[in-house]
Structures are given as structure tokens and as C-alpha cells.
């Protein structure tokens, strides 16, 4: 089942270091089954705020996405993003959950 990786940037403390992250990420993705859907393209915030940029990618499975995220190549550079910018990152399975199953086993019960 396809999985979407969504990262929303909420703030940047050191752009130079974040640019090092962006420059270093491509080699970690070589040979990976990631389909880039949107990466820091123009956007419009409909609700909420504090959005500086958005990344959306499609992976063939949750396992494939997690394997890349936990790979030694990505582990070696992800601190450049984590230490120098504030992001929310999620993996979302494709599909639509029925209303009665939405938010089950989550903190919002």
C-alpha cells in the first residue's frame, strides 16, 4: 500500500546548516523507490499557521519509507534538519478510514 511522507517546516534557526542538509539528502535517496510529489513548491495555508515549506513524497510501503529513514546514510545527516529547523514529519497510509475508525487509539479519543 502506498505511503505518503509529509514534512512541514515551521521554523528555521540556521539556514546555512539546513541548506547543507538539503545538499546532502540526494545521495541518500539514490536507488530508493521514492516518488517526489512536491518539494518546497508554492503553497497556501488554509488553516493554522507557521508553515514555511512543505515536502510530500510517495513510498511503495511503510517498510520502504522506514528503511530509508533508519538507513545509515540518512541517519548521518538528519541531525542537520533536526538541530536547525522545526519540522513535523509524518508517514500516512493511502486510503480513507471509515468515520468510526478515525482517530482510534490516538490521544484525541
Predicted features by range, described:
Residues 77-90:
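C-terminal structural segments of small proteins and small subunits
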Amino acid at each position: 500500500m502506498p505511503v505518503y511522507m509529509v514534512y512541514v517546516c515551521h521554523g528555521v534557526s540556521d539556514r546555512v546548516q539546513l541548506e547543507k542538509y538539503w545538499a546532502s539528502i540526494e545521495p541518500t535517496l539514490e536507488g530508493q523507490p521514492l516518488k517526489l510529489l512536491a518539494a518546497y513548491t508554492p503553497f497556501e495555508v488554509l488553516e493554522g499557521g507557521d508553515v514555511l515549506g512543505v515536502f510530500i513524497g510517495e513510498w511503495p510501503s511503510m517498510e520502504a519509507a522506514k528503511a530509508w529513514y533508519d538507513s545509515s546514510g540518512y541517519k548521518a545527516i538528519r541531525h542537520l534538519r533536526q538541530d536547525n529547523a522545526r519540522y513535523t514529519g509524518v508517514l500516512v497510509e493511502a486510503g480513507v478510514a471509515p468515520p468510526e475508525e478515525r482517530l482510534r487509539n490516538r490521544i484525541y479519543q
